[in-house]
Amino acid sequence: MIPATCTLSQITARLGGEWRGEDISVTAVRPLADAQAEHISFLANPKYKAEVHDSSAGAIIVSAKAADGFEGRNLIVADDPYLYFAKVARLFSPVVKARGGIHPTAVVEPGATVPASCEIGANAYIGANTVLGEGCRILANAVVQHDCKLGDEVVLHPNAVVYYGCTLGRHVEIHSGAVIGADGFGLAFAGDSWFKIPQTGAVTLGDDVEIGSNTNIDRGAMSDTTVGNGTKIDNQVQIGHNCKIGSHTVIAAKTGISGSVTIGSYCIIGGGVGTVGHIEIADKTTIGGGTSVTHSITESGKHLAGIFPMSEHKEWARNAVYIHRLSEMNKRLKTLEQQLSDSKDTQ
């Protein structure tokens, strides 16, 4: 356990990197503009280099290339300053471990398996035949319905809900208000009304998955909706039924993924993206915020953007320049057409 105050040499002994200057003690990570003498900050983007000279930070995490410009400052030199900053921040904010015990107001149904190492909070509910791994934290008002299986050290924050029959891997974290395994939007038209199709699948989340607040992942119609290991999904995201999301993909807030979409691994999907259903998105695809994805993306590594229609990012950027000039261009086009028409009339 790292102490609340630690030296640069202690940090580098734990995380690697090279410290330069004085082996000072620091207490927390802060932005360059806010940092004081007891804080450590970081420079990940060269455009903020000028802020380093004005910063009161006691120490700064920089790349080897940037370090040469900051002689006299206390530094930690790292290959990836942003990643290193994240790891230092984790040192000062360690993961909270479960305090074993079940709150008197919690309900644990018969047949549920709850190891003594688990923490079950006030008014939490554990359904019949559900199995929890070691060290789980099911916090106040969280619900795990019947026949679920949770791996070790899963965290359900207050008011998170996991519907029946779902499976969560190890070290999964579900934030407040998220719902895992609600019914998918499956309906058949019966001539004068809609007939609901029973959603008999479930949801399976891999290891190290994190789901943001008020995000919904619908259960599959017949087979499971799945999310791969290490994938991180932001707040207020909708994942439709039967979706298959690969490993280590990130999806930002307010994105809607329609039913039966397959998303590869290591994809980056920006905020406010919307997709049609029944398409495939290849591995390592990057989709810019607000993009409408209307067809499959079959080539790995593409960077796409565009409100409508979606296109290659470079093509969209070029076209976007002209959007604000469309009215002017239309007037010029009409003028040219009129001039051409007048020219023909005089011939």
Curated annotation (Swiss-Prot):
EC number of this enzyme: 2.3.1.191
Active-site feature positions: 241
Catalytic activity: a UDP-3-O-[(3R)-3-hydroxyacyl]-alpha-D-glucosamine + a (3R)-hydroxyacyl-[ACP] = a UDP-2-N,3-O-bis[(3R)-3-hydroxyacyl]-alpha-D-glucosamine + holo-[ACP] + H(+)
KW Transcription (keyword) present: no
Top enzyme category: transferase
Protein keywords: Acyltransferase, Lipid A biosynthesis, Lipid biosynthesis, Lipid metabolism, Repeat, Transferase
Signal peptide start and end residues: none
Pathway involvement of the protein, from the record: Bacterial outer membrane biogenesis; LPS lipid A biosynthesis
GO biological process per UniProt: lipid A biosynthetic process
Pfam families in alphabetical order: Hexapep, LpxD
CDD domains: LbH_LpxD (cd03352)
GO cellular component, one term: membrane
Alphabetized GO MF terms: N-acyltransferase activity
Function: Catalyzes the N-acylation of UDP-3-O-acylglucosamine using 3-hydroxyacyl-ACP as the acyl donor. Is involved in the biosynthesis of lipid A, a phosphorylated glycolipid that anchors the lipopolysaccharide to the outer membrane of the cell.
Record's protein name: UDP-3-O-acylglucosamine N-acyltransferase
Protein source organism: Neisseria gonorrhoeae (strain ATCC 700825 / FA 1090)
Primary gene name: lpxD
